[in-house]
């Protein structure tokens, strides 16, 4: 009843913490009910089953939370590889591979990495804000509403619906992808809500000239190994600063290490770099790997045809990626 009165609900699928209140009463009532059974052996069997269920539930709960923690740590390490610094007042919208139930699931880790100190002397005010990816946020982004105000547990935030940056991981196998309204690239696995507001995501809020930040060991853990996502993030950063030569160098490293994209849209920085450097053989290799992802293929075609490249290269790109 107290949970319902404050507008919360119990979700058994996600091991909701709101069941803890009721669990105390249940723990008292169940032994009383079992005590009415006269057969002592049957009582032992029932208690054994209940203890077994409780143990498995706690193990499953711990396993799920450990997996979510690892996934979240990996998410923010990738962000740190991609983004040197975020401007004060940036409003993030994240799409995690795991569920995000509150806005502080985003602004909490973001501020720990980029702006660990409060912006105000007398109360806690983070430098980076966040919005939940839900229908309410989508409506306000469409309506171009301005700055909002929220105070929770004496922490003040000022998210702005006109000042958003979207960070998305479409599925666990995908890398974290920064959405940029100047060139929107969407995974075939992307959430429909992200697709709706992708054209409002402002990558200009990334401060490219700053030094890269290292996430603190607690709570982000040790740095993951440098696999595909590391090279993708560094290539995406190099592309944003216009260093196409560096993108090509990273692409060659990817091929030498035989790394593969699990989400084909992540080839885009390398495709553009190889188009600028007129490396047709690399474009052919990438095209053969991307061929099964029709949406990624279509986006590659559209982007290549708008690039300022030699007509012969554009013709080759059309042949490779623009399948009618």
Segments the model singles out, each with a brief description of its role:
Residues 28-58:
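Signature aromatic-anchored transmembrane alpha helix within multi-pass, membrane-resident enzymes
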Residues 37-43, 74-76, 93-107:
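Juxtamembrane/interfacial segments around transmembrane helices
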Residues 24-27, 79-85, 90-92:
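Conserved beta-strand->loop/alpha-helix structural units within folded catalytic cores of enzymes
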Residues 10-36:
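Hydrophobic/aromatic-rich transmembrane helices and adjacent perimembrane loops
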Residues 52-81:
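Hydrophobic alpha-helical transmembrane segments in integral membrane proteins
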Residues 1-14, 54-63:
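Transmembrane-helix signature of polytopic, lipid-linked glycan biosynthesis machinery
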Residues 83-88, 96-324:
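C-terminal luminal/periplasmic domains and tails of membrane-associated envelope-modifying transferases
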């Amino acid at each position: 009843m107290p949970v319902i009165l404050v507008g919360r609900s119990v979700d058994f699928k996600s091991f909701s913490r709101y069941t803890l209140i009721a669990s105390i009463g249940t723990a008292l009532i169940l032994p009383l009910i079992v005590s009415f059974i006269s057969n002592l052996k049957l009582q032992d069997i029932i208690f054994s089953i209940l203890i077994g269920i409780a143990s498995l539930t706690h193990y499953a709960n711990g396993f799920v939370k450990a997996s979510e923690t690892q996934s979240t740590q990996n998410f923010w390490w990738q962000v740190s590889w991609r983004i040197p610094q975020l401007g004060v007042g940036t409003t993030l919208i994240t799409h995690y591979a795991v569920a995000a139930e509150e806005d502080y699931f985003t602004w909490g880790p973001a501020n720990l990495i980029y702006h660990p100190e409060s912006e105000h002397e007398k109360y806690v005010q983070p430098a980076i804000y966040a919005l939940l990816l839900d229908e309410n946020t989508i409506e306000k982004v469409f309506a171009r509403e301005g700055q909002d105000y929220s105070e929770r547990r004496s922490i003040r935030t000022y998210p702005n619906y006109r000042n958003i940056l979207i960070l998305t991981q479409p599925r666990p196998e995908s890398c974290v992808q920064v959405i940029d309204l100047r060139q929107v690239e969407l995974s075939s696995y992307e959430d429909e809500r992200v697709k709706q507001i992708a054209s409002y995501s402002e990558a200009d809020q990334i401060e490219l000239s700053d030094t890269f930040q290292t996430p603190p060991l607690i709570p982000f853990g040790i740095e993951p190994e440098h696999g595909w996502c590391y090279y993708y993030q560094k290539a995406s950063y190099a592309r944003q600063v216009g260093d196409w030569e560096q993108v090509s160098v990273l692409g060659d490293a990817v091929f030498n290490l035989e790394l593969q994209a699990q989400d084909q849209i992540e080839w885009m920085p390398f495709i553009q770099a190889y188009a600028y450097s007129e490396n047709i053989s690399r474009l052919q290799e990438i095209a053969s790997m991307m061929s099964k992802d029709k949406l990624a293929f279509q986006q590659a075609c559209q982007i290549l045809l708008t690039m300022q490249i030699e007509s012969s290269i554009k013709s080759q790109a059309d042949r490779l990626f623009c399948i009618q």
